[in-house]
């Protein structure tokens, strides 16, 4: 797997945490978001990966490209269930997703 990431991106950090908790190997592909030093996320090469020009983006082992940290983490949870990130209880799962939504949308 390849994770297109920026070290100061909280969205990328969430995915890196999920990958680490699951013990999954990945290659970090740094995307410099700063202009004028970087702005790599606005270059045609990266826009072909994520047309929104945002990080993170994940290229799976099968070659599929995924964007948006909640979707990537959900994919990891379903694709690699051996080390679950979510509790088994339905209500507890919903509560965890609620907290994740607050963090992702409101923080």
Question: PLM ranges: what are they?
Answer:
Residues 1-107:
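GST-like domain detector, emphasizing the conserved glutathione-binding G-site
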């Amino acid at each position: 797997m390849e994770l297109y990431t920026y070290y100061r991106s909280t969205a990328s950090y969430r995915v890196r945490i999920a990958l680490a908790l699951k013990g999954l190997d990945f290659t970090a592909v740094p995307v410099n978001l700063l202009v004028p030093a970087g702005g790599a996320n606005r270059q045609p090469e990266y826009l072909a990966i994520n047309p929104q020009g945002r990080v993170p983006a994940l290229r799976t082992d099968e070659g599929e490209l995924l964007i948006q940290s909640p979707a990537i983490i959900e994919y990891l949870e379903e694709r690699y269930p051996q080390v679950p990130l979510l509790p088994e209880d339905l209500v507890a799962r919903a509560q965890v997703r609620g907290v994740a939504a607050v963090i992702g949308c409101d923080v």
